Design a protein with these regions (language model features):
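Class I SAM-dependent methyltransferase SAM/SAH-binding core
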Residues: 28, 32-79
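A short acidic, Gly/Pro-enriched loop at the edge of an enzyme's catalytic core
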Residues: 77-89
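A short glycine-rich, Lys/Arg-flanked "PGG" loop and its adjoining helix->strand segment in the class I
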Residues: 102-117
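Conserved class I S-adenosyl-L-methionine
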Residues: 117-145
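Short alpha-helix
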Residues: 135, 145-168
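Conserved catalytic loop of SAM-dependent methyltransferase domains
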Residues: 165-190, 199-200
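C-terminal lobe and adjacent flexible extensions of AdoMet/dcAdoMet transferase-like proteins
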Residues: 188-272
Length: 272
């Protein structure tokens, strides 16, 4: 008995000319978004065949999801990770192909440390790619079977969870042609799109940071070079020479930031 053909996965779609066109741009954006995020643990949820963390320098990097090849096999809606244990979360096209994107974002907020960051990639509904999806052409195939999420909508979701967008970009303005030669002929639209219609890129990559209420960085207000010495607690010394040397060292001390955590409530705000 013949088996019905299986639907192409998103990972397989990225191997097509159209998918490779998108992936080339997204790889550069992921590299730029994660290379300056520091910490100890970073996790990519979904699409293990695409290493979105390759430019990140954290010592512990792993993938999580239901697909073969993930470091941690788990439902993307329920992560077997401790709360406040991760410094960076990357979601490559996970939200638009899941029935409960809100739950995924809640899990991201839960596992992220305060000031941890989240990077999200998605298809833009306000683009030629979004137009093709609305026309219903090949709606059952990737990526058209997904629920494209607009940037304003995503921003509101993140804001409700306490995340704060801090970076992002849209790209890939050419029509979603299936053949590479046509995508190359419309390559001129990349520079034109960045300049004239930047909100109409076919895909986006954004970064947000998790903020926590009651937490703020406080730096002393130094008015002059002697303020550092005055800020240090006085210590009784019998030897005046030692005391003078200590004061001189205090004037050369660098300003230190103090982290003040107030309140017992749990909150969050992410940066992107």
């Amino acid at each position: 008995m013949l088996q019905p053909p299986q639907r192409q996965t998103l990972a397989e779609w990225f191997e097509t000319p159209k998918g490779a066109y998108v992936l080339e741009w997204e790889r550069a954006q992921f590299d730029s978004a994660v290379e300056d995020v520091f910490g100890f643990k970073s996790v990519q949820v979904g699409l293990p065949s695409i290493d979105c963390l390759r430019a990140n320098r954290m010592p512990f990097r792993f993938t999580l999801g239901a697909e073969p090849g993930c470091t941690i096999a788990a439902d993307p809606r329920h992560w077997p990770l401790a709360s406040h244990s991760v410094d960076l979360v990357v979601l490559p096209h996970l939200l638009e192909f899941n029935q409960d994107p809100h739950q995924i974002l809640r899990e991201a907020e839960r596992v992220l440390m305060p000031e941890g960051q989240i990077v999200i990639a998605g298809f833009n509904p306000l683009s030629l790619w979004g137009l093709k999806r609305r026309l219903g052409l090949r709606r059952a195939a990737h990526p058209w079977c997904g629920e494209f999420i607009g940037l304003l909508r995503l921003r509101d979701w993140l804001k409700l969870l306490g995340f704060e967008l801090n970076g992002g970009r849209l790209g890939r303005y050419a029509p979603p042609f299936s053949q590479a030669k046509w995508l190359q002929r419309f390559a001129f639209m990349e520079q034109a799109g960045d300049r004239w219609w930047p909100i109409c890129g076919g895909v986006y990559v954004v970064r947000a940071v998790k903020r926590v209420r009651g937490m703020r960085l406080v730096a002393p207000q130094w008015k002059n070079g002697r303020a550092t010495a005055r800020a240090l607690a006085p210590v009784a010394r019998r030897d005046p020479a030692v005391a003078q040397a200590g004061a001189g060292h205090g004037r050369r001390a660098s300003v230190r930031l103090r982290l003040i955590v107030g309140g017992a409530g749990r909150g969050g705000r992410a940066r992107g």
